[in-house]
């Protein structure tokens, strides 16, 4: 594991950005939302896929749960499908997935990588990303609690976490050329820091 002085998160590595951008082909026009099936599986990536649950966002109409996850340097939008992720988690641990899990570390055992259109992202997920950015999200199918301790990040550390969608390497793949006229990264961080009435995170 790399020691990162600027982002001193214990038991945490930075793998999100490189792993996600490595799966997106700039020259391919995706006709399906799925970018990579089994993007995370026992043998799919070289680094252990540990992420921190920064916060839960909204519950969708199909009872899936959306969230913001992070490694030591970047954040990404994720969704936990009710079936199988939430059902299996709550059977395994005998409590709701939102109970004492924000700010804890999870091990992603299986996940797909897929695009979500901006309309769905806004109406169903409660997040607005600039229209000219194609948004790839983690569809987490199976997870385990890696470290249950809810360790709050300092404000300075969390502020240094960057949404992958605004990283230059991601924009080179998924950004569009037209002028930006929507929310920037600062405004996005304000949106995702809000509390949502339909999700209880203890």
Swiss-Prot record:
Keyword Nucleus recorded: yes
Quaternary structure note: Component of the telomerase complex.
Name this protein carries in UniProt: Telomere replication protein EST3
Species of origin: Debaryomyces hansenii (strain ATCC 36239 / CBS 767 / BCRC 21394 / JCM 1990 / NBRC 0083 / IGC 2968) (Yeast)
GO cellular component: chromosome, telomeric region; telomerase holoenzyme complex
Family: Belongs to the EST3 family.
Alphabetical list of Pfam families matching this protein: TPP1 (PF10341)
Keywords: Chromosome, Nucleus, Telomere
GO molecular function, one term: telomeric DNA binding
InterPro entries tied to this protein: TPP1/Est3
Superkingdom of source: Eukaryota
């Amino acid at each position: 594991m790399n020691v990162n002085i600027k982002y001193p998160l214990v038991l945490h590595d930075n793998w999100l950005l490189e792993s996600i951008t490595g799966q997106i082909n700039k020259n391919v026009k995706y006709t399906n939302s799925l970018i990579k099936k089994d993007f995370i599986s026992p043998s799919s990536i070289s680094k252990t896929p540990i992420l921190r649950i920064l916060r839960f966002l909204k519950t969708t109409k199909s009872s899936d749960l959306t969230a913001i996850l992070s490694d030591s340097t970047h954040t990404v939008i994720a969704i936990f499908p009710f079936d199988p992720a939430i059902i299996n988690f709550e059977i395994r641990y005998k409590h709701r997935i939102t109970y004492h899990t924000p700010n804890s570390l999870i091990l992603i055992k299986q996940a797909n990588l897929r695009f979500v259109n901006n309309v769905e992202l806004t109406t169903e997920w409660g997040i607005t990303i600039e229209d000219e950015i194609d948004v790839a999200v983690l569809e987490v199918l199976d997870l385990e609690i890696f470290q249950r301790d809810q360790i709050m990040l300092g404000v300075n550390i969390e502020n240094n976490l960057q949404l992958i969608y605004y990283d230059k390497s991601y924009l080179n793949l998924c950004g569009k050329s037209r002028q930006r006229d929507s929310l920037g990264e600062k405004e996005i961080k304000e949106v995702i820091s809000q509390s949502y009435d339909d999700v209880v995170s203890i």
